Amino acid sequence: MTVSGAIPSMTKNRTLVVGGTGFIGQFITKASLGFGYPTFLLVRPGPVSPSKAVIIKTFQDKGAKVIYGVINDKECMEKILKEYEIDVVISLVGGARLLDQLTLLEAIKSVKTIKRFLPSEFGHDVDRTDPVEPGLTMYKEKRLVRRAVEEYGIPFTNICCNSIASWPYYDNCHPSQVPPPMDQFQIYGDGNTKAYFIDGNDIGKFTMKTIDDIRTLNKNVHFRPSSNCYSINELASLWEKKIGRTLPRFTVTADKLLAHAAENIIPESIVSSFTHDIFINGCQVNFSIDEHSDVEIDTLYPDEKFRSLDDCYEDFVPMVHDKIHAGKSGEIKIKDGKPLVQTGTIEEINKDIKTLVETQPNEEIKKDMKALVEAVPISAMG
């Protein structure tokens, strides 16, 4: 029999989110609550940072129930899964805790009541790509989790949502929290290899749509909207259109990315290894969907649209006008080699950009930037 659509549950699945206060986890938790699922957040016992405390309180106010526990304690997890009658477990644990999921899987296997498990993937299809180290170690650990899920016969869905909608800095873990460059573009390789860029809220929304959809049972779910498939050259042009100015482009070679990855600075080198895999190897676009093991979001929900990358980049425009928190008025602040541009009048913003130009240590780049600033004033941004 052919299943033509999703089969909704009569009752909402009770969903446990592990790592629900993290970067991607917040999108998942928000969507779970938005869809009306009884949502439980697993939080590690002990003190939390003020920022995480705010996140937890916000989700509690929206109806989430906080459960304290750790996934590498089988007895603890068995008790939680039984006591709260959990139906779905979504894991978003970070790289250092990926193998802790193996203990969680033992608990899931023991209770025998979990309808769906979503492991901590939320990126590439780890069985189809081989980044250099140190990223490869992370993928090997994710593969171990996949194999354990299959061995235990646990119903699963692997979310392969590719890249977050942002500028892909090769040395930044969460680039969507940083605006695209205002001084120069770093172009990886020839800049023409494409990748898929997905808004965080879409990752949350579509993930939650899959958890009780029979068509996603024991499948890899791929986020590959053609509308959001861009090369880094195309990303640069999109951002230039947004800010009304042309920025110089400089090539970051494959060797440069590999060298940065080889430095083994965690987590920055992991990001470099993934950047190389995406923009040099083309890991997001160099394979075809296997109808037996894969499904695409576009096929599952053809009437549901992804937020466009053009719209996503609109969110970054106000960020380049935000006031910098500097010790002296009018001071330009550089963080991790990236400018934080302050708000103010057009004259103030132009002054800050010119200050940035004058502090550029590379004379050749400074010359190019100065010419661009004089040719295209900030007033073009509107």
From Swiss-Prot:
Pfam families: NmrA. Pathway: Flavonoid metabolism; proanthocyanidin biosynthesis. It catalyses: (2R,3S)-catechin + NADP(+) + H2O = (2R,3S,4S)-leucocyanidin + NADPH + H(+). It comes from the Eukaryota. NADP(+) binds at G19, G20, T21, G22, F23, I24, G25, R44, K52, R146. The active site is at K142. The keyword ATP-binding does not apply. One of its GO terms (biological process) is proanthocyanidin biosynthetic process. Keywords: NADP, Oxidoreductase. GO terms for molecular function: leucoanthocyanidin reductase activity. It is an enzyme of class 1 (oxidoreductase). CDD domains: PCBER_SDR_a. The keyword NADP applies. Its EC number is 1.17.1.3. Catalyzes the synthesis of catechin from 3,4-cis-leucocyanidin. Also synthesizes afzelechin and gallocatechin. Monomer. Belongs to the NmrA-type oxidoreductase family. Isoflavone reductase subfamily. This is Leucoanthocyanidin reductase. It comes from Desmodium uncinatum (Silverleaf Spanish clover).
